[in-house]
Amino acid sequence: EDHPWDVDAVAGPGPTRETGGLWGGLIMLGSAYIAHTDSNGVNIGNNIIEGFLPATAVDNDGDGRDDILEYGFDETFARDDADNSGVVRYVSIRHGGYEVGDGNEINGLTLGGVGTGTVIEHVEVVSNQDDGIEFFGGTVNTSYISMMFNQDDSFDIDEGHTGTHQFWFAVQNPNSADNGGEWDGVTGGSKSSTDASVTRSAPQIYNATFVGAGPGITGSDKGNNAFLLDDYFAANVQNSVFHDFAEAFVEVKSDGEGGFSASNNTIGAFGDYDGANNGSVLDAPVEFVVSNPFFSATGTPINGHTNAGTDPGFSAYTRDGSGYLTSIDPRPATDSSPRTDDVSAGAPAAAAYRGAFGDTNWLLGWTWADAQGLVADALVPATDVDVIASQTAFDAFYGVNVLTGSTTWTSDKIYILTDRIYVKEDQVLTIEPGTKVYGTFDDNGTAGNFSDDKVGAVIVARGGQLVADGTLEAPIVFDAIQSLEAVRGEDHPWDVDAVAGPAPTRETGGLWGGLIVLGRACIA
């Protein structure tokens, strides 16, 4: 139904991946350090947020900036790098970025002078008409941030931002996105200032995965680089994955680099890569090309980086004809660069892999991307365990196959149920979070005789226990063997056909048994 709060008389329609600018965004302003210089190169220390200004806003302190939208420090608010602007956790921000003026839109999440006392984690921004998230100075730290199909930069940094960030994920919009990151050091009248009051942006970024709009995209006149450096930007980017951008890996403006460093990053496909010279993915002044942290003067990777064009090994990755990503499992395969190449120490959370994802897909369960079916669950271990053959024995007392004893099924293996298994009294079957179990059935060629059917199932008898305690991010999955075959693209011997899959759909049932738990409480 139509609601009275919008300006039309139409119910909906529901926004899509292409739809942005339908409302504003979320803006948080604090009193931590920002770098905004005057014409003499001295840091002013505060600024007014871009986006919109209410007509009734008042400048009480006479600094030319209306007070309600100021951020940073001044005579009213002392500098507080531990500023606490609140908590934003498990929040999805969708279809915002209202255009308040020609070329002036609102970011999905804007953080102006926000300090380390603020919690920003597990946040998603989808299809925003401007940047996904922008840091204007401040010291705030973030983790588990996802940007999907935003129409400008995914991660924008400016004005002396110095936070520490881990587990950033970006998928660019193929028709209007700019860079994965637009990263600036300082703003104001004298960006080259050497005044001691000016500290340029120098964040620490670990475990990012940036996916571009695809190398053949033609619908946008914007940058389509993994990231752009400007205004003396300094940072340290480590243990990250950058892939499938139409232009350069790094674009650097003439005054862009201000102490930038990087190590142990996987460099994927880029439109500018000529197939032979790693330096072709750098769109930068000669000074940066000569001393860049990625490749030597002869183009050899240094500081643990890969060659350009390295496959990041995503477990699933498909696009439609318009360039939109339609399916991704960003967890890398076990033999891929993000899994096997070295990582740098020092990240806030230990992660023995490059990029934003290891075994756990933290997008599942709470994001728009998952709800829309864009997040595939295609990473499966290589080791298969035939439970009937290896973990059960015939029990003469019960006349069935029971577990040989209490056991734990671990997430680094696949468990195959070719028939019923029983957990009898005093036995405990423990299943780790993230474990996948696949069942089969075999009617032995006698469709009308059910007595000889073999049906994968788990039956917990009285006195036995099943401890299957999954998590939001690592659920335990029981499924049909056809799903495993579809993911691997090969037929397995445990079912009765010679076909790989096909993957079951919402209409498909009856492919295995189920889960049965029997207790000894009162029944009537």
Question: Model-derived features: where do they sit?
Answer:
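Glycine-rich N-terminal segment of FAD-binding domains in flavoprotein oxidoreductases
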Residues: T435
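Extracellular beta-rich repeat passengers
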Residues: E1-Q151, D156-E432, T440-Q465, D469-A524
